From Swiss-Prot:
Binding site for Fe cation: 96, 98, 153
GO BP field: DNA damage response; intracellular iron ion homeostasis
Annotated protein name in UniProt: PKHD-type hydroxylase SYNPCC7002_A2658
Organism: Picosynechococcus sp. (strain ATCC 27264 / PCC 7002 / PR-6)
This protein's record includes keyword Iron: yes
Length: 219
């Protein structure tokens, strides 16, 4: 299940981040790619293990932690890896699947957080493959798209301008995407019921089911 998560970052936070990135040191994106992904990865990434990178990563993590939709839909145990990527003209990231394990943790959910507006560049769509179709995403600044890390995906070539994104990986409390979707649907339903009717018997039963499924499936 794919989730568009709007307004992860405020306009003020976006401006601060993009200004910082303008002056920051970027390195070859191949340095963080798996052995076969290096063959199709052509972008630049913010140098890791610098005070600038650590401060920006913490800012994004805090924004995700306070985002209700991200927390409910993804059930993050930890956001274990964050990268800031830049694509200029001619850059792209070909078809690949993300590594299953990163920094000793499982990658259940991948996300791309768009840092500049679609009008700032041409091309650069994130394309995620399904069983018999593809979905393309080029979203407003501050919006994230989250999707199962099991998915084949690519970034189309940027033909004009600069594409800025933060990409990250999550180990979820619930590793299976279908199970996460079931819990999410029940959680949304109980919250909607509570907003309409308050604390009813039906709300209590749905809340019990959400809690018990979390007990059953969390790891």
């Amino acid at each position: 299940m794919f989730f568009k998560i709007p307004q992860v970052l405020t306009p003020e936070a976006l401006e601060k981040i993009t200004t910082t990135l303008t002056e920051a040191e970027f390195v070859d994106g191949k340095l963080t790619a798996g052995w076969y992904a290096k063959l199709v990865k052509e972008n630049q990434q913010l140098a890791k293990a610098t005070p600038t990178a650590q401060a920006l990563e913490e800012q994004v993590r805090q924004a995700l932690q306070s985002n209700a939709l991200f927390q409910t839909a993804i059930r993050p145990k930890t956001v274990h890896t964050l990268l800031f990527s830049r694509y200029g003209p001619g850059m792209a990231y070909g078809r690949h699947t993300d590594n299953a394990l990163m920094n000793g943790m499982r990658s259940d959910v991948s996300f791309t957080l768009f840092l500049n507006e679609p009008s700032d560049y041409e091309g650069g769509e994130l394309v995620i493959e399904g069983a018999d179709s593809e979905q393309s995403y080029k979203l407003p600044a501050g919006t994230a798209i989250a999707y199962p890390s099991t998915s084949l995906h690519r970034v189309n070539v940027v033909t004009k301008g600069t594409r800025l994104v933060a990409v990250g990986w999550v180990q979820s409390w619930i590793r299976d995407a279908q199970k996460r979707e079931i819990v999410f649907d029940l959680d949304v339903s109980r919250r909607s019921l509570f907003a309409q009717s308050g604390k009813t018997t039906e709300f209590d039963l749905l809340s019990k089911s959400v809690a018990n499924l979390l007990r059953l499936w969390s790891e």
